[in-house]
Amino acid sequence: MNPTEAKAVKTEPEKKPQSSKPSVVHEKKTQEVKPKEHTEPKSLPKHSSDTGVKHAPKEKAVSKSSEQPPSEKSTKPKTKSQDKISGGGKSTVPAAAAAASAEPADKNKENKLLTSAVPAESKPSKPSGKSDMDTALDDLIDTLGEPEEMKEDNTTYTGPEVSDPMSSTYIEELGKRESTPPPKYKELLNKEEGIAGPPPDSLKPLGPNDAIDALSSDFTCSSLQLTTCSPTADGKETEKEKSTEEALKAQSAGVIRSAAPPKEKRRKVEEDTMTEQALQALSASLGTRKPEPELDPSSIREVDEAKAKEEKVKKCGEDEETVPSEYRLKPATDKDGKPLLPEAEEKPKPLSESELIDELSEDFDQSKPTEKQSKPTEKTEASPAAAPYPVAEDVPRTSMCSLQSAPPTAAPAKGMVPDDAVEALAGSLPKKEADPEDGKPVEDKVKEKAKEEDRENFGEKEETIPPDYRLEEAKDKDGKPLLPKEVKEPLPPLSEDVLLDALSKDFTVPSDTSSPQFEDAKLSAVVSEVVSQTPAPTTQAAGPPPDCARDNKELDDALDQLSDTLGQRQPDPDENKPVEDKVKEKAKAEHRDKLGERDDTIPPKYQHLLDDNKEGTPGKPKDQRAQGIRNCGEKPAGAQDPIDALSGDFDSCPSTTETSTDTPKDKDKKPASVPKHLGNGGKAKDSTKAKEETSKPKADGKSTS
């Protein structure tokens, strides 16, 4: 149902009885004029066809009544008759639904056909005034086919009776209508102005005609009048305008100034309106939209673009080089062209209490000047100098919002400057005495009662150690505690003279010596320990005579003989004992033959070396030393004895035969046991001696020649 039709029904209630009295005589005429438009589908029930026949005389009566008024109001009865027909159709639909079970789709189609038949019935009564739009609509309606036949559903309901015990009661909201608010509240509303009234009974949406009228009112009419208070010029003015005014007033919540649209404009708009059924039929005659063809993905080709490379471009001003010379910052220079140093910012000095009081009490009551007391006041750059007030003006009562000052008692005298008043006020204050406690350090007022307590650490005493973790005394097999090992008495320290005498014993035998005599065993042990612990003292001996040439080889032999003269070291009983490994390893030792360990593993080209050793050179280092001593004794005439060469500076005696004869005796007495600290040195000497023996024949050949 169109909203314009509903409004037309509401606005003209006085014309309803005229058009609502149908005559039975006109039923046959309407059926003869338009038999096509009243044809109902065959499948419809009987009661639906009866209702259609009943509506026909009403439509005819409406068309006749609409012809009587003048042409200006001819459009209104049409809309009214349509509204009544549609209203009548609506009233008969529930009755038809109660009589038989017909589908709601058939009823809607039936109502549409009835409403579309109304403008077609007015053809014979008014053929001359028919517009082209009406004829086009009639032709379009004729092209529509009959509705499809629907099979009747004759199944009867055999279930239990359906009952709806619920009842609905409508409760009206307070203040929705003018009659609902209490009388006292109405008085308050009447007293206050500018408050919008209550909303209307039912807010109906504006139709297209009302919207067009409201929008085109300002263009068509120049004179403005208040719609809320303007009286209607025509006595037959309908309630349609009032309803539009109420709707506009509710939306804008204020007074709206608009002019009523002219009647000619309204008539044209109503004539041009098309019904919904005609628009639906027109849209159905249009063809369906063809779907767009889908794109074939195989036809799409990928475009290969060159790979973009990132290049870093220097921006203007990023570096100092890119900034133009005109825009570069130039440092400030003096007359000589040297850059000026930045001036140090002067920090404002903190104000004292007296200065703060002076500044705060500046605008308060100023006493009369008695004598100008000059007191120097330190003023910083931050506090600007106060300008003198004009003579006629009074000092303001307050300078700060948070301070409340007393009213001024007297106006300042002529020529009075606020600085003088501040100085006078500051001079009246006593001088601040220095607090002796200012320089003292802050003492803690909180006294702690913590005391230091000595606590024994766990394990510090044997009592605090658990029995499982205490050290057990070493016991023997019988369970007796082992006696502590006797500490060896440390040997007496020897002076440098005693050591020199012990070392040079074999070289010189001085007649008058007061050195203590030690046993050979003790002396050898002491000497070996001292040599191992401390380095031997360096003695500077006089150089050999220039006419006797000495060879490095002879010096080495002399040193070897000197090392043999050292006493024997007492063997340590625990030295040869194997070290017991507490960690038991499961690794098994495998014996592998080393190259040269047996005669079979020696290559044939090295066999002659072994044969030479068997014949001449012994394999042990002891025999090598003995052989070296023999070779030294068998030197040809002209070669000097190495012992004589070394002991020449120490011994003043000319005879050297005794020392040469004593050396084999000492060697026979002392076995070839080398001290522990000289073990590595002996091995090194053996290797050097083997090289020297090979070079001995060459040296002998040179000496003989």
From Swiss-Prot:
| Ranges: Inhibitory domain repeats | 149-202, 292-344, 434-487, 571-624
Q: Does the keyword Transmembrane helix apply?
A: no
Any one Gene Ontology cellular component term annotated for this protein: cytoplasm
Q: Where is this cross-link: Glycyl lysine isopeptide (Lys-Gly) (interchain with G-Cter in SUMO2)?
A: K10
Keyword hit for Nuclease: no
N6-acetyllysine PTM sites in chain numbering: K28
The annotated regions of Basic and acidic residues compositional bias extend over 7-17, 24-62, 173-194, 234-248, 289-317, 327-352, 365-381, 430-489, 571-625, 683-705
Looking up InterPro entries in the UniProt record yields: Calpastatin, Prot_inh_calpain
Question: Which keywords does this Swiss-Prot/TrEMBL entry list?
Answer: Acetylation, Isopeptide bond, Phosphoprotein, Protease inhibitor, Repeat, Thiol protease inhibitor, Ubl conjugation
Instruction: Give me the stretches of Low complexity compositional bias.
Output: 63-72, 94-103, 533-542, 651-662
Which residues are recorded as modified (Phosphoserine)? S65, S202, S230, S352, S354, S361, S428, S504, S515, S563
Which residues fall in a compositionally biased region of kind Polar residues? 275-286
Q: Domain of life of the organism in this record?
A: Eukaryota
Q: Where is the composition biased (Acidic residues)?
A: 135-151, 355-364
Recorded GO MF terms: calcium-dependent cysteine-type endopeptidase inhibitor activity
Query: Coiled-coil segments, which residues?
Result: none
Using the record's annotations, give every residue carrying the modification Phosphothreonine: T115
- The segment annotated Disordered runs over 1-211, 226-493, 527-705
* Protein role: Specific inhibition of calpain (calcium-dependent cysteine protease). Plays a key role in postmortem tenderization of meat and have been proposed to be involved in muscle protein degradation in living tissue.
User: According to its record, what is known about the domains?
Assistant: Each of the four flexible inhibitory domains can inhibit one calcium-bound calpain molecule by occupying both sides of the active site.
Name the family the entry cites: Belongs to the protease inhibitor I27 (calpastatin) family.
- Protein known as: Calpastatin
Native species: Bos taurus (Bovine)
Which gene underlies this protein?
CAST
